Amino acid sequence: MSPAPVVAQSANGHSPIVGEPEVLEDGTVSSRSVESSPAWLGLKEAVSALRPLQVQDGSIPGDADHPDARALVSTIAGHLRAFVPLFPHDADYLNAAAIDFERWASQGFAVPDFFDSLEAFQPQRDRVDGLRHLVVFPMYTQNGSTDRLVEAVLVEVIWPEFVAVLEAGDYSNRLFVPIRFLDFTDGYDTNSAVLFPETIAMRTVPTFTWGAIFADREAARFRRVVREASAITKLDLPADAARLLDDQHLAEETFVMWDLIHDRTHMRGDLPFDPFMIKQRMPYFLYSLEELRCDLTAYREAVRLERAEDTDDVTRDHAKLVQYAVLFDRIFRFAITGTRVRNYDGVGGQLLFAWLHQHRVLHWTDTRLIIDWDDVPEVVIALGREIEELYWQSIDRPKTAHWLAAYALVSTTLTPHPASNWARVVDGRRDLPLDGPPKGFTDAVLPDEFPLSMFYEALSKKMADVIDSTAGLTGRG
């Protein structure tokens, strides 16, 4: 039997929004099948043909390319307007995007400015499970394309009922939009798993905006990487963890719960700095601690929800799974994914592994990984408390003193590079420009300040092909 439609009133005044299933009355292409329709394929083809004409900043400087570019932009704008009946909740955005494309062409394809259409795109207002969006912007993709080329993406909202209840209660996060891929252009055939407004070409960045995370990509690469890593390390997976690796849908919902709590944590707690750390230049291990703090907060809250007597069965089950997801993604995927150049997520994964090992709840013995599961929660939560204590104390510290204290926290557990000036102490003082501006501190951080341990060096070699295979991965494969 088909599920009953999920209906919600749109916050922007349009007609009610219908989630799964959604079928147009005239029997033509519906948003349920749009990814295989000639309309979408035509739009995708036009976008893909336009991209090679652009340069890094998104402009098209070659006059000889302008006739072709104008024809492609005309096709794109026409498709955007034609999609309005399929995506009535995005009507304002689709029309505004068509206008932005046409303005870009009429102004000679200078650096694109899609601020107006970005302002019209408000997916956080309509978080309905199964609701679909068509997104077309000139943009770079985080951990993907560094050029602001036009991208076209079809996405679907993931908003299970238990997450809606959590968000309406203690875990409010009104700008958080979890989504899954339906189809995309080349900028997302990469490791990028986010859609953030600040990546879009525009004249100014809005102050507060939504953030979308591709939970299907997160879940799919987690399942592939952890399955391989657990086999290599001969880790005996608990039944619930194995269930998570076997079920993409369950993994997606688990990552949505994790991301919901992680994302809101950036704005909460005793913060000694502006929450928008991305705008600040500082030693990259500060980012390691902030991202890890948010993940460990999600872990701690998952433990609390699992243990609370009034937690419903569905939420309790997912809370248990969030704990496995945070732990395994951090120690198996984060630590060995990406280059060793200022890899702040890598350092966070290394730190969690070493912390667990040095607190003797994780063991690498006889070439087998063993985890004392009953003791893990308190040890993980203790690391979170260490970071929170650092933050609380640093409210009263100057910036560089906070940086030094943060380095001490990390280097107590992770061994720095032997050539590190940060680690070297001369005449009782760190070998840093202590009397100079903060820039000198940041410049002194090595690109790989905390190299991989011998355990991780060996694991990364065995895992390299699997890690590489996750680029472009979605819940569909």
Regions of interest found by a model, annotated:
Residues V18, L24-V29, S37, E252, ...:
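Long, well-structured alpha-helical subdomains associated
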Residues R81-A242:
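Contiguous, non-catalytic segments that form substrate-binding/exosite surfaces or channel walls
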Residues A241-W258:
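Short pre-active-site segment immediately N-terminal to the catalytic Zn-binding motif
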Residues F255-L271:
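Active-site recognition of the HExxH zinc-binding catalytic motif
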Residues D270-L292:
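Post-HEXXH active-site segment of zinc metalloproteases
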Residues L286-R304:
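An active-site-proximal "capping" alpha-helix that borders the catalytic cofactor pocket
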